[in-house]
Swiss-Prot record:
This is tRNA (guanine-N(1)-)-methyltransferase. S-adenosyl-L-methionine binds at G115, V135, G136, D137, Y138, I139, L140. InterPro entries: Alpha/beta_knot_MTases, tRNA_m1G_MeTrfase_C_sf, tRNA_m1G_MeTrfase_TrmD, tRNA_m1G_MTases_N, tRNA_MeTrfase_TRMD/TRM10. PANTHER family: TRNA (GUANINE-N(1)-)-METHYLTRANSFERASE (PTHR46417:SF1). Its EC number is 2.1.1.228. Keywords: Cytoplasm, Methyltransferase, S-adenosyl-L-methionine, Transferase, tRNA processing. GO terms for biological process: tRNA N1-guanine methylation. Disulfide bonds: none annotated. It is an enzyme of class 2 (transferase). GO terms for molecular function: tRNA (guanine(37)-N1)-methyltransferase activity. Belongs to the RNA methyltransferase TrmD family. NCBIfam families: PRK00026.1, trmD. It comes from Rickettsia conorii (strain ATCC VR-613 / Malish 7).
Amino acid sequence: MSILHATILTVFPEMFPGTLGHSLAGQALNKNIWSYDVINIRDFGLTKHKNIDDEAYGGGNGLIMRPDVLGSSIDHALALNPNAEMYYPSPRGRVFTQSFAKEMLKNKNLIFLCGRYEGIDERVIEEYNVKEISVGDYILSGGEIPTLTILDCLIRLLPGVLMNQNTLSSESFEEDGEFKGGLECSLYTRPEIWRGRAVPSVLLSGNHRLINEWKKEQSHMITKLRRPELLKDL
C-alpha cells in the first residue's frame, strides 16, 4: 500500500501522471511510494453529448460546471477513497506553501477536483466541504497544472523519494531548515572559473564555520531583496 494516494477528477484524464511519471516522482510511483487514480468527469455528463457545464445564473461570461454532474463524480471518488480530504485548485483559495504542503500530508488520502471553464457551482464546495487552494495570483485554463504542481511538492516530502532526506533542510521556505524559512543561498559547482566569473573564495576555503556564515548571509540578503515578507518570521 502506498504512503500517499491521490484521486484526480478531471475532464482531461490523459494529462496524468504527466510530469509526475518522470524523475523523482516517477521513480516513487514505480516504487509505490505514492499512487493515483483518475476519474473522468465527463463519464458522468448529461445527455448523449455528456454535457458537464451550463450558463451562469445571474448572467456573466463563461460556463459553470454543473453540481449534479460534479456531485456524481465526487460520490464515485469518495466511494473509492472514503476518508480523503478534497481540494479544488482556485485563485480564490488559500495560497499553497511549503508549510501548507506538510499540513496537507497529515491526510495521506487526497482528492483533487480540477475545474474548467469559469469554475464550479458554489454548492459543490459547500456540500463536500471542499478546500480551495491557489498556486498563485494568476489565472490558468484549468486545475490540472496546479494539481500536478501541488502533487510534485507533496511527493518529494515523502520518505524514500529523495536519495538524501537531509536535502530538504537546506531548501528555500523550510521553516526548520538551514535558512529558517527564507530563500536558499546562491549555488556553485565546477569549473572554479567560468567566463571570468569565479566561485566565491570562502566556498573553497574548507572552513565550515565561515562557509555556513556566508550561506546564511547570502540567504538573508537574497530574501530581503526578493521576498522581504518572508523575513517577518525570521
